[in-house]
Amino acid sequence: MEDRVEISLLMDFYGPLLTEKQSEIMQWYYNDDLSLAEIAELNQTSRQAIHDLIKRCYKQLLSYESKLNLLQKSINRKKEIMNFLEHLKNKYSIDDEDIIKYKEKLENL
C-alpha cells in the first residue's frame, strides 16, 4: 500500500533519478495534491496515462530503494542518533536545549 509520506521521502532521495516529466507529475500528484484529471489536462493526455505513469514511477522509486536502501539507512541513522542522545541525556543530565543542539549537529554530518 502506498503511503504519501513514504512516497514523499522516496522522492526526496530518488526523485532526481526520474525524468523531468515524471518528477513533475509525481510532485503535482503527491505534494501539490492535484487530481489525475487536473494533471491529465495540464499534460493534454488521459487520466489513465497519468495513473499508469504514477504507478510506474512508484515502482521505480521502490526499485531504487530496494537496491540502494538510502531511505532505510537514513531512518536507521536518525533512530541511532536519537537513542544516543537519549543515552547522553540520561547518563549526564543534559537538558533538552543542549540535546536539540547536539541532534542538529549530528544530523548535519
Curated annotation (Swiss-Prot):
Q: Which residues cross the membrane?
A: none
Cross-referenced InterPro entries: RNA_pol_sigma_r3/r4-like (IPR013324), UPF0122 (IPR007394), UPF0122_fam_protein (IPR054831), WH-like_DNA-bd_sf (IPR036388)
Spell out the Pfam families in the cross-references. Answer: UPF0122
Q: Which domain of life is it from?
A: Bacteria
Q: Which family does it belong to?
A: Belongs to the UPF0122 family.
Q: What does this protein do?
A: Might take part in the signal recognition particle (SRP) pathway. This is inferred from the conservation of its genetic proximity to ftsY/ffh. May be a regulatory protein.
**HAMAP family (UniProt xref):** UPF0122
Protein name according to UniProt: UPF0122 protein Cbei_1174
Taxonomic lineage of the native organism: Bacteria, Bacillati, Bacillota, Clostridia, Eubacteriales
